């Protein structure tokens, strides 16, 4: 059986094209998108599930094969929305087991954190709910190796009547309260 699918558009008037810099599968993978998220999103471009699956968006490849029905193919062109793909990717990242996420996140963590004493699995546990793409990871953890140099002007505010000496006293007073909070790992 031959089926014609509507084109995937970059915007309302232009088809996606590698000539115009639109991303390929390999480009999306390099940008930190998971294969499962890409497949799920692309499957829903120009097709929508029917019946009791009509409101559902997230499918495994096996589930897509089971629920696919040719009647769900749209005649209208579909517009590729990178924000929607990013949303799908974030859903897939958050749905992963902590162990699986740590395994795929470690190369991105090690890209920014060279200190071998830093536990990549512990860092991954903190990042899983905060990342939309794997390539977000290095910029979120680069401070582990080198803290930025903050000047004393950060502690000066005329409106709040603070200066470095007052700020130091306030921070010293806050230490006992913060120490009483216990676990800081989350």
Tell me the role of every PLM-derived stretch.
Residues 1-93, 106-107, 165, 186:
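Alpha-helical recognition segments enriched in aromatics with Gly/Pro capping
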Residues 98-186:
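Small-residue-rich helix-loop
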């Amino acid at each position: 059986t031959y089926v014609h699918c509507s084109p995937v558009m970059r915007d309302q008037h232009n088809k996606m094209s590698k000539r115009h810099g639109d991303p390929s599968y390999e480009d999306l993978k390099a940008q930190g998108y998971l294969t499962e998220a890409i497949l799920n999103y692309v499957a829903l471009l120009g097709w929508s599930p029917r019946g009791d699956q009509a409101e559902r968006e997230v499918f495994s490849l096996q589930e897509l094969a089971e629920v696919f029905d040719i009647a769900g193919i749209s005649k209208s062109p579909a517009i590729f929305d990178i924000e929607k793909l990013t949303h799908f990717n974030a859903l897939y990242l958050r749905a992963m087991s902590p162990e699986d996420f740590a395994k795929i996140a470690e190369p991105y963590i090690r890209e920014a954190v060279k200190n071998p004493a830093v536990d990549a699995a512990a860092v991954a546990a903190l990042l899983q709910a905060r990342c939309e793409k794997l390539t977000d990871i290095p910029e979120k953890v680069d401070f582990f190796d080198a803290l930025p140099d903050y000047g004393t002007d950060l502690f000066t505010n005329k409106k709040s009547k603070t200066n470095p000496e007052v700020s130091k006293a306030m921070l010293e007073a806050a230490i006992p309260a913060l120490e009483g909070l216990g676990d800081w790992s989350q």
